[in-house]
């Protein structure tokens, strides 16, 4: 209902659109553009100046961050190169130590082999000497046993030989 009242009042006061372009629109547009240029120039200039300053500050900050990042990158690349050199040095030192340890182990193994050979040789020599001594003892015992046997046989068969042997033995001991 309010809308109906509003429409009724508009018709009464002749409120409506004037369709004559020359009378209304060009003048209105000129006034609006003039007001916008007069008041908007300062506001637009200030806004554009502020925006230009913000952009310049952002560019300067970005350039500073880029320089800082480039410096950090250079430092990190230098650290990486040093770390690679250190790793290569450590690797080389480890290879040298491994080679020395290998050579030391080989030398110790050779010494142990030589020691075992000498021990085996000494054991063999000792065993040979023991065997030879044992054989000599057996041969001596057998020879004595055989000589005793032969002596008993001769003495029991030959009384004259027995007397001669007793006389010689007494003479040797300092008898007659």
From Swiss-Prot:
Keywords: ATP synthesis, CF(0), Hydrogen ion transport, Ion transport, Membrane, Thylakoid, Transmembrane, Transmembrane helix, Transport. It is a single-pass membrane protein. The keyword Thylakoid applies. GO terms for molecular function: proton-transporting ATP synthase activity, rotational mechanism. InterPro entries: ATP_synth_b/b'su_bac/chlpt. It is found in: Cellular thylakoid membrane. It comes from the Bacteria. The chain crosses the membrane at residues 26-45. GO terms for cellular component: plasma membrane-derived thylakoid membrane; proton-transporting ATP synthase complex. Signal peptide: none annotated. NCBIfam families: PRK07352.1. PANTHER family: ATP SYNTHASE SUBUNIT B, CHLOROPLASTIC. F-type ATPases have 2 components, F(1) - the catalytic core - and F(0) - the membrane proton channel. F(1) has five subunits: alpha(3), beta(3), gamma(1), delta(1), epsilon(1). F(0) has four main subunits: a(1), b(1), b'(1) and c(10-14). The alpha and beta chains form an alternating ring which encloses part of the gamma chain. F(1) is attached to F(0) by a central stalk formed by the gamma and epsilon chains, while a peripheral stalk is formed by the delta, b and b' chains. Belongs to the ATPase B chain family. F(1)F(0) ATP synthase produces ATP from ADP in the presence of a proton or sodium gradient. F-type ATPases consist of two structural domains, F(1) containing the extramembraneous catalytic core and F(0) containing the membrane proton channel, linked together by a central stalk and a peripheral stalk. During catalysis, ATP synthesis in the catalytic domain of F(1) is coupled via a rotary mechanism of the central stalk subunits to proton translocation. Component of the F(0) channel, it forms part of the peripheral stalk, linking F(1) to F(0). This is ATP synthase subunit b. It comes from Synechococcus sp. (strain PCC 6716).
């Amino acid at each position: 209902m309010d809308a109906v009242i509003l429409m009724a009042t508009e018709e009464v006061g002749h409120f409506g659109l004037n369709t004559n372009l020359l009378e209304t629109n060009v003048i209105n547009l000129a006034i609006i553009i003039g007001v916008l240029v007069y008041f908007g120039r300062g506001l637009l200039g200030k806004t554009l100046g502020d925006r230009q300053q913000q952009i310049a500050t952002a560019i300067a900050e970005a350039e500073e961050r880029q320089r800082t990042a480039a410096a950090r990158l250079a430092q990190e690349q230098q650290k990486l190169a040093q770390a690679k050199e250190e790793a290569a040095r450590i690797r080389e030192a480890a290879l040298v130590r491994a080679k020395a340890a290998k050579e030391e182990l080989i030398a110790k193994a050779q010494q142990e082999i030589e020691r075992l050979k000498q021990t085996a040789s000494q054991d063999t020599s000792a065993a040979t000497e023991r065997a030879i001594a044992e054989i000599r003892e057996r041969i001596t015992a057998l020879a004595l046993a055989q000589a005793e046997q032969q002596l008993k046989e001769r003495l029991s068969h030959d009384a004259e030989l027995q007397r001669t042997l007793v006389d010689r033995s007494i003479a040797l001991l300092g008898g007659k």
